[in-house]
Every structure is written in structure tokens, then in C-alpha cells.
Amino acid sequence: MAFDIHGFIKELLEKRKVFHNERDFQIVFCCELLKKGYTVRPEFYFDEKDEENKENSRRKYLDLVALIDDECIAFEFKYKTAELEENIGGEKYKLFEQGARDEGVYAVLSDVCRLERVIKNNTEFFDKKITKGYVVFLTNDGGYEKGFTRKG
């Protein structure tokens, strides 16, 4: 059975709706995968080879790689926040306005490109090729829903 990323995230967000930062979200995501019995490796390092320009070859990492139902899946995470100061379930959250939405979108697109290269280059984890990748973008900033225009 294929991994249902939407169902997994929905289930995770029912347990916890707010995170202090991107690392907090990554840890909770990783723990939920572990609870389900999956093998996970946060900050999975790999050698990215550039066949056209060998000097561009370098060591890179993915936020998370998991072995899920015999399928190797890579994950990249982005958590972009608007200002929020609230007590939720007895826990105080203070999120800062990150702004620069254009840079946030660029970072997401860079992650998509990295995942595409990882899959194309047959990167392996536990002797299995990474065959699927997800960029998980989480935000409380409604500005990301409005889209972008270029002025000038």
C-alpha cells in the first residue's frame, strides 16, 4: 500500500497544530514515522555528483529519508511563519514574522529540484533507491495563499 502523505500529515496535525520552528516540526514528523515502525534517518547525507562539471560535485543532505513499506522516500521541510504569540494547550508559542515570501517560495522550489536530482541520480538508502520525494510546506502565513506578482 502506498504511503498516504496527506493522511499522515492530517493525522499529525490533529495531535498538534502549532510548532515552535521547522526543527520542532521535523522531529515530531520523524517521531510519528518511528511510532508506525518505519526506518528513518534525519539529515541524510549523500554525494551529489555533477557529471557535466565535476568541480560542482559536493556533499549535500536531505532533511529526512525513510523506508516506508519497502519504499525509500525523501522529505524536505519548510516552515514559514507569520507572527503569533499564543498559549495552546498550556504551551506558549511565539512565532516571528519571517516575511520575504519570494525567498520562501524559491527555497521550496530549490528543495523540489534537489529531490528530483536525488531520484534521477538513483541515490540509495539501505541499498534501496530513493524513488519518491515530498516537500512538506507548513505555514500560518496567509500571504502564501495569495500568490505572487512581479512588479517593475
Predicted regions and their residues:
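Interdomain/boundary linker segments immediately adjacent to catalytic/signaling cores
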Residues: M1-K35
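Short, well-structured alpha-helical interface segments that form or flank functional binding sites
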Residues: H20, D24, V28, R59, ...
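A short acidic/basic microdomain associated with nuclease active sites
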Residues: L33-V65
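A general structural motif
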Residues: G37, D70-E71, I130-K132
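A structural signal for isolated positions on well-ordered beta-strands in alpha/beta enzyme cores
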Residues: R41, I73, G133-V136
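Active-site beta-strand-loop-beta-strand hairpin of nuclease catalytic cores
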Residues: L62-F77, A82-L84
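Catalytic cores of nucleic-acid endonucleases
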Residues: Y79-K146, K151
